[in-house]
Regions:
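C-terminal motif of bacterial Sec signal peptides marking the signal peptidase cleavage site
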Residues: 14-15
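Acidic, metal/ion-coordinating pockets
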Residues: 19-222
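Positively charged n-region of N-terminal signal peptides that target proteins for export
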Residues: 1-4
């Protein structure tokens, strides 16, 4: 917007002079080329929040092919909107716990589903929800490992306390903005966490502490 406003004023100013068209074009081109984000930084950040990315049994069956699973058309009608956002944040409400792939009530989606999510333009995932432990310790850890393999930032579940301490609150930086992202769940359908794994449960004392830590990161929003 700052670039646009500057150029509009410049064009109006030059149109009121008696300079030749060539001279006007030369000045406009020179000044336009000299503008940079360091002088006029981007002041807009587009955020998209989506939930819940799930796979019920019917969806898993529909994606099955002779060689695996194909989700390439899953986001066809929304992919453009997803990619318009600078940060497209989604709640991954399934585990990637491996075979057998199952829907409700204990979800485990094919790995190809995560690939499709990534290819659609989602670039941040939150993983703390009531299905985080549908495949227990192995499902939680495998889900994290697969997300990490795609280098997608994520928040909510952790292999151990050391990982949580290093990665949480999740600091996102884009277009000169800094955002601290927090994620919690009310529960995991009665399935207990197996140490040393961590699921961020709603706990006001812990949340208050996390908020203070996020403030120390000096974000523009949290």
């Amino acid at each position: 917007m700052r670039h646009t406003l500057f150029l509009m004023i410049l064009l109006l100013s030059l149109s009121c002079t008696s300079r030749s068209q060539a001279k006007r074009d030369s000045i406009i081109d020179t000044l336009s080329d000299s503008l940079s984000d360091s002088i006029f930084p981007t002041d807009t950040l587009r955020l998209l929040f989506v939930g819940d990315l799930m796979q019920h049994q019917g969806q898993i069956n529909a994606a099955r092919t002779s060689t695996g699973y194909d989700y390439s058309t899953c986001f066809t009608y929304v992919k453009e909107e997803i990619k318009k956002a600078d940060l497209s944040i989604a709640n991954l409400e399934v585990t990637l716990g491996g075979k057998p792939y199952k829907g409700y009530p204990a979800f485990s989606a094919p790995d190809e589903f995560l690939t499709a999510i990534h290819d659609a333009g989602f670039n941040v995932l939150v993983t703390a929800n009531n299905h985080s432990l549908d495949r227990g310790k192995s499902g939680l850890e495998r889900t994290i490992q697969l997300i990490d393999s795609l280098k997608v930032p994520h928040a909510g579940t952790y292999i151990n306390a050391d990982e949580r301490e290093k990665k949480y609150p999740l600091l996102l930086e884009k277009n000169g903005f800094r955002i601290a992202l927090l994620n919690y769940t009310y529960g995991t359908n009665g399935i207990p966490v197996t140490p040393p794994n961590i699921v961020n449960y709603i706990d006001t004392a812990i949340i208050a502490k996390d908020i203070e830590e996020s403030k120390a990161m000096k974000p523009d929003a949290s």
